[in-house]
Amino acid sequence: MTDLSCLYPSLLCTEAAKTSYDEDTTSVSSGLSPPGSPVDLQNSLDHVKRPMNAFMVWSRGQRRKMAQDNPKMHNSEISKRLGAEWKQLSEQEKRPFIDEAKRLRALHMKEHPDYKYRPRRKPKSSNLKQQPRLNIAMPTIPPQSLFNYSTAFDSLKTHDLSQYYSSFFQSPVLSGSTYAPYNMMAAYARQAAAVAAASQVSASTTPTAPAT
């Protein structure tokens, strides 16, 4: 290993990059299946990992250092802080990591010429379809309570308008105590129409005096 690293120093960098990349992605892939299970072993053999980009090359050392300094900090919070620090770097400061990412990408294409990125989709949980619907029962009101509620609306009834309409007609047709105001209005309207029709009939039957 020492002779090969002296002859090919890039080989040592590549192996170190792969090792660091595996350590960074362990927390993400470990939640899919228990470690050491046959499913996890088969996925690790079949799945080809993406090459690291410039940010991943830069953050692999920064992430480890920040995790050591803040052991209680969540991984998502570390990623947010690293992303903010990466944006503040100048293009000149990012250049070495961009070049390293290009080299790793070219090496990845050489080792896996048929590679095509296929993101893993989360399985759709069928729990949403199987959730029972909420059955909310409407409150039931006994019939006797309905009659008790009706007395509360007695004060909202309209006033007796029979005296008002009686001033326009000689004899009241209906009594306001037994009929609703709208029925009284209809009755008075029918009486007015009958009086108008009778006056038209009497006018048409009255003879006119001959002209001299």
Curated annotation (Swiss-Prot):
Entry-linked Gene3D superfamilies: High mobility group box domain
Positions in coiled-coil regions: none
Record keywords: DNA-binding, Nucleus, Transcription, Transcription regulation
Residues in the DNA-binding region annotation: 48-116
Organism placement in taxonomy: Eukaryota, Metazoa, Ecdysozoa, Nematoda, Chromadorea
TM region(s), chain numbering: none
Keyword DNA-binding: yes
Stored Pfam families: HMG_box (PF00505)
UniProt protein name: Transcription factor sox-3
Subcellular location, record wording: Nucleus
GO molecular function, one term: DNA-binding transcription activator activity, RNA polymerase II-specific
